[in-house]
Amino acid sequence: YPNVDLSNMGCEECTLKKNNVFSRDRPIYQCMGCCFSRAFPTPLKAMKTMTIPKNITSEATCCVAKHSYETEVAGIRVRNHTDCHCSTCYFHKS
């Protein structure tokens, strides 16, 4: 096999993409794409501190807006992203 990094195969670089759902009277952009992620065995020292030990640890960065502003489209408040970067992942739970 060729010596090629295929870790992000099928996933484009983190960049601004036009959101066709919200782009009606003007373009609305959102950050989309892939960033760094990896999984590795949990170090024994860290495993001993866990309430529920997990033998695999993962770390990642997500494609997020570096700059954005709020705007309204058809009565809905949306954020129009103007710049993207790979940074801390934020998960929104209901």
UniProtKB/Swiss-Prot annotation:
It is found in: Secreted. It comes from the Eukaryota. Keywords: Disulfide bond, Glycoprotein, Hormone, Secreted. Disulfide bonds join C11-C34, C14-C63, C31-C84, C35-C86, C62-C89. Glycans are attached at N55, N80. GO terms for molecular function: follicle-stimulating hormone activity. Belongs to the glycoprotein hormones subunit alpha family. Shared alpha chain of heterodimeric glycoprotein hormones. These hormones bind specific receptors on target cells that in turn activate downstream signaling pathways. Involved in gametogenesis and steroidogenesis. This is Glycoprotein hormones alpha chain. It comes from Thunnus obesus. The lineage of its organism: Eukaryota, Metazoa, Chordata, Craniata, Vertebrata.
